[in-house]
Amino acid sequence: MRIAFYAPLKPPDHPVPSGDRQIAQLFLAALRLAGHEPVLVSCFRSFEGYGDALRQARLAVLGERIANRLLSHCQEFPEFLPELWFSYHVYHKAPDWLGPAVAGALGIPYVVAEASVTPMQGSGPWADGHRAVESAIRQADAVIGLNSEDRECILPLLREPWRWVALKPFVDAATYGRIREPEGEAPRLIAVAMMRHGDKLASYRLLGDSLSRLLDLPWSLEVVGDGPARCDVENALVRLNERVTWMGSLDHEAIAARLALADLFVWPACNEAFGMALLEAQASGLPGVAGADGGVAEIVVPEVTGLLVAPGDAPAFAAAVRSVMLDHGRRATFAKAARQRVLLEHDLPVAAHRLGEVIDALGPACAA
């Protein structure tokens, strides 16, 4: 099936790496593996992060124009007519101004992956975007949810409850390292995250606070990532001194190589939906210590693949890291379980099979 693919927050070919870009790329790979033909139909970014109503209005108008151009293209070249529209990551700051219009005009199914709705945004600075997302969800033939916490607010908007389709976050496990036994007296900790203000910086600050309580133990920390909050992140970890190695921004292959050399993934995950880096670490056979925020518990299973700590609790986070570092056998058990769980539940072929079932059930002519 020819599928029009669109990611309003960040297209899969965007030059700046991020979890959103990675997930968009993974969805493209999964759709191809399921036997379909996804085509990126637009790189238009509808994201507006400052609550600027005028800019949001301009983006909405631009989105309408692009949607009309896409429809004109379909009329001119009917051999490229899509049979289904698939949008990834739609929320109030990045509404989908293209998919509902094009899918509705063509009479094809409209599918959204990772849509989220926050009722409080209905009267906030992104109210127009919020209403657009609600409208898109009402039109959707299926909403694929990666985070179970989104379900409660989305279900009331769907035409039927069965249109919510749960899909576990996934990676291509074949690209990550094999399981290995922990080695050496000084465990190698690793954190992988962009350096942005807000939630990412909050996680780095909590990480610095937590690890500063463990200076009586031998360990090292690699930090993979970069961004506009780099100076603030360095200040957050300044008490760790020479124990930290700053790796900067790395490509996918280099990140996989660093994960393969580490012993423990540590990340507070403040206000994160689920965290792709945590899933990559688990695929690499790394146990994790993480904050129990958002959908992180769907990635790190407590006492099975790692430990979860109450959000924002630096002493508890430090205690959890200490306990895993000091117990080599426990760390090895977590590592094996982490890799196995990814292969069984979070691997690309598993996701491709599930997506294939959903799309095949919709068919090219089921849109209401």
Which positions does each model-derived feature cover?
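Donor nucleotide-sugar binding/catalytic pocket of nucleotide-sugar-dependent glycosyltransferases
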Residues: 134, 138-178, 188-194, 245
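Conserved donor-binding/catalytic core segment of Leloir-type glycosyltransferases
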Residues: 181-202, 208-212, 222
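Nucleotide-activated donor-binding/catalytic signature segment of Leloir-type glycosyltransferases, i.e.
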Residues: 231-253
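Short alpha-helical donor nucleotide-sugar binding micro-motif in glycosyltransferases
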Residues: 249-250, 257-262
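Aromatic "clamp/platform" in nucleotide-sugar-dependent glycosyltransferases that forms part
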Residues: 270
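Short hydrophobic beta-strand element within catalytic cores of glycosyltransferases
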Residues: 287-290
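Conserved acidic donor-binding segment of nucleotide-sugar-dependent glycosyltransferases
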Residues: 302-303, 307-314, 323-329
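A short, well-ordered alpha-helix in the C-terminal region of glycosyltransferases
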Residues: 323, 330-345, 351-357
